Amino acid sequence: MGNAGNITAYWKGFNEYYKKNKKYKLPKMMGFQSSGSAPLVNNIVVKNPDTIATAIRIGNPVNREKAKNVKKESKGDFQSVTDNEIINAYKLLAKEGIFCEPASAASVAGLIKN
């Protein structure tokens, strides 16, 4: 997660769908940040965020409060992954023929970690 726009938008969409079709459960929302730039994980403002995942190198997310609500409402979790874990996930994806930028590999790193 960087500015947390995606996770908040996804949650909004899941809720709108759920209101119309209650036969499906709402998901538990998971968000992953680089350990060098993890303001939502650590509940702080990171003055000098540092990570190879430039797309999520955000020290003070615009959607901080919305993201906190998503975590609470969905009974979800936010966790951090190291740059090394991101790189390892990136390499694993590449072996499968899937090429992405490091911020996208952060989610896969988080899933591997769990």
Task: Enumerate the predicted regions with their spans.
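Catalytic phosphate/nucleotide-handling subdomain of diverse soluble enzymes
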Residues: G110-N114
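Gly/Ser/Thr-rich loops at beta-strand to alpha-helix junctions
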Residues: M1-I7, S104-A106
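Short Gly/Thr/Asp-enriched flexible loops that form oxyanion-binding sites at enzyme active sites
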Residues: I7-Y17
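Active-site/ligand-binding loops adjacent to catalytic centers
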Residues: N15-P102
